[in-house]
């Protein structure tokens, strides 16, 4: 555990309650800088304490937005979501920049079309035989709301020649 005395971070002093709080959060899971900043503001830490603590954690590589984006992208893809939905969540809810999201996607290089097919198979096992317009609309709404582009899934719906 970190001592009760103040720690040095660059030229500024940082209180150990702020550092203890952030380390406790990071011990449980990854957080984006934006999420940690919001949580620390809710706890009433000063902007200087927040800046110093986050800079210290980033210097020690305890907090890294790129690593967070890669882990989040992998996790959400495994839960059945497409890139558009994941990107929106990372930007709006987690405060990650478009550049970092693109870097994470390039690093991981997932095959979104194959992923869309996997999601289709799981959610709609008879996807290749769908001819009913209402059911096709349901499939389209589901896939679009989960962040898939039409070109990633449309040609599979109602076409048996793509069945493996």
UniProtKB/Swiss-Prot annotation:
What does UniProt give as GO cellular component? cytoplasm
- What processes in GO biological process is this protein linked to? regulation of DNA repair
Q: What is its main location?
A: cytoplasm
Q: Does the keyword Cytoplasm apply?
A: yes
InterPro entries on file: RecX_HTH_1st, RecX_HTH_2nd, RecX_HTH_3rd, Regulatory_RecX, WH-like_DNA-bd_sf
Q: Which UniProt keywords apply?
A: Cytoplasm
UniProt xrefs under Pfam families: RecX_HTH1, RecX_HTH2, RecX_HTH3
Q: Where in the cell is it found?
A: Cytoplasm
The organism's superkingdom is given as Bacteria
Q: Does the keyword Transmembrane helix apply?
A: no
Role: Modulates RecA activity.
Q: Which family does it belong to?
A: Belongs to the RecX family.
**What is the protein name for this chain?**
Regulatory protein RecX
Which species?
Answer: Pasteurella multocida (strain Pm70)
Gene name tied to this protein: recX
